[in-house]
UniProtKB/Swiss-Prot annotation:
The gene is hutI. One of its GO terms (biological process) is L-histidine catabolic process to glutamate and formate. This is Imidazolonepropionase. Catalyzes the hydrolytic cleavage of the carbon-nitrogen bond in imidazolone-5-propanoate to yield N-formimidoyl-L-glutamate. It is the third step in the universal histidine degradation pathway. It catalyses: 4-imidazolone-5-propanoate + H2O = N-formimidoyl-L-glutamate. PANTHER family: IMIDAZOLONEPROPIONASE, IMIDAZOLONEPROPIONASE-RELATED. Fe(3+) binds at residues 78, 80, 247, 322. Keywords: Cytoplasm, Histidine metabolism, Hydrolase, Iron, Metal-binding, Zinc.
Length: 423
């Protein structure tokens, strides 16, 4: 007898097509089972199919989905989860047209977050991040990448990473830890960025030993770290056994996309200014293009990443919130799906694949997350929607009814029909 059966699923989005990254037409394809059923035992999916195929199955608990939709848990592959403070006091300055550098000189911008993060205790950071994770869970997210990067010194970076490790133990959401010590150049290292990067590299062996970090990231941008500095830094991180990511071409077409493809990065993120050559190189690589349209939207910029061109040319595209206190303070990945549909010209099918299958590969979770398949852990979302297009169409709210993590209900806001019936 199974532990749980979800029955009467109007649309069961398994996302289970070909293994590996989805590109071109595969991104525009959604495997859907009408009148579907999912069986769960010991936190693992043991049955996926139609009601007809499920006849005779029994479970301790049978949940009637009411004809609504069920999908895999969503994957958010780019967040800056652990930080202190907030920056709502900067909104008025931005609206007045005060340049970011001037805000920075006043102690605002990233410096404000760095100072608040330094002053916060690890436990304070953990509790604050739990609040944000709870919200992510309520939007249907069950796997999250979490970056450090608000320390710019060894003590605070360690504190952020240790907070992430504690959250992994204490919160239902699966976390993937990324070291972003190279997020900016501290004032004391102005003009000496290579020395700062060497300092960050010197921290990596101990991080590897303590298994606190899976990915190493760097902010490759004008005025921060050059393409050559970024490549050298990430290649050294790879030599130490880390997988790598890169904040690439967010503002200027520096060649970050090209660098990511060249060194075999797991993902290149932002890519608003990615060149035609960069897009071509990404299309011919296994590097995922993780697009962050919520950031462009919140910064009130006109030019978004060329998501439509990327998909048409064969780039594997993922979507993420880029949740952070400065440029995208939202945990709402459903809103990101809507913005991607409207501003990146992605179809609903492409959007769904970008927050499940491709986003899981962007953080090396393609074999465990992003699909409903027998043998995988039961990370599932029941939606207050009857078809997948409705979720990005009806924007600005959460359509999530219930979230299962490893077969257990981790979040619910609706009423289900609970019984011990046999189909």
């Amino acid at each position: 007898m199974l532990d749980t059966l979800l029955i009467n699923i109007g649309q069961l989005l398994t996302m289970d097509q070909e293994d590996g990254l989805l590109r071109r037409e595969a991104m525009n394809t959604l495997p859907v089972i009408e009148n579907g059923v999912v069986g769960i035992e010991n936190g693992v999916i043991t049955f996926v199919g139609t009601a007809e195929e499920a006849k005779g199955l029994q479970a301790k608990e049978v949940i009637d989905s009411g004809g609504k939709m069920v999908s895999p848990g969503l994957v958010d592959p780019h967040t800056h989860l652990v930080f202190g403070g907030s920056r709502e006091n900067e909104i008025a300055l931005k609206l007045q047209g005060v340049p970011y550098l001037e805000i920075l000189e006043q102690g605002g911008g990233i410096l404000s977050t760095v100072n608040a993060t330094k002053q916060a205790s690890k436990e304070e950071l953990v509790q604050k991040a739990k609040f944000h994770l709870d919200r992510m869970l309520s939007f249907g997210v069950t796997t999250v990448e979490a970056k450090s990067g608000y320390g710019l010194d060894d003590e605070t970076e360690w504190k952020q990473l240790e907070a992430t490790a504690q959250l992994q133990k204490e919160h239902p959401i699966d976390l993937v830890s990324t070291f972003l010590g190279a997020h900016a150049v501290p004032k004391e290292y102005k003009g000496r960025s290579k020395e700062f990067l060497q300092w960050m590299l010197d921290l990596l062996p101990e991080m590897k030993e303590k298994q606190l970090v899976e990915f190493v990231d760097i902010f490759c941008e004008t005025g921060v770290f050059s393409v050559e500095e970024s490549k050298e830094f990430l290649l050294k991180a790879k030599e130490l056994g880390f997988d790598v990511k890169i904040h690439a071409d967010e503002i200027d077409p520096l060649g970050g996309a090209e660098a990511a493809a060249e060194i075999g990065a797991a993902s290149a993120d932002h890519l608003v200014g990615a060149s035609d050559k960069g897009i071509e190189m990404l299309a011919n690589s296994n590097t995922v293009a993780t697009l962050l349209p919520g950031t462009t939207f919140y910064l009130n910029k006109e030019s978004f990443a060329r998501g439509r061109k990327m998909i048409d040319e064969g780039v594997a595209v993922a979507l993420a919130t880029d949740f952070n206190p400065g440029s995208c303070p939202t945990e709402n990945i459903q809103l990101i799906m809507s913005i991607a549909m409207l501003k990146l010209k992605m179809t609903p099918e492409e959007v769904w694949n970008a927050v499940t299958v491709n986003s899981s590969y962007a953080i090396n979770r393609g074999d465990v997350a992003g699909k409903i398949r027998v043998g995988r852990k039961a990370d599932l979302v029941l939606w207050d929607a009857y078809n997948y297009a409705y979720v990005p169409y009806h924007y600005g709210v959460s359509h999530v009814n219930t979230v299962w993590k490893n077969g257990n209900i981790a979040y619910t806001r609706g009423e289900q029909s609970w019984s011990t019936a046999t189909i």
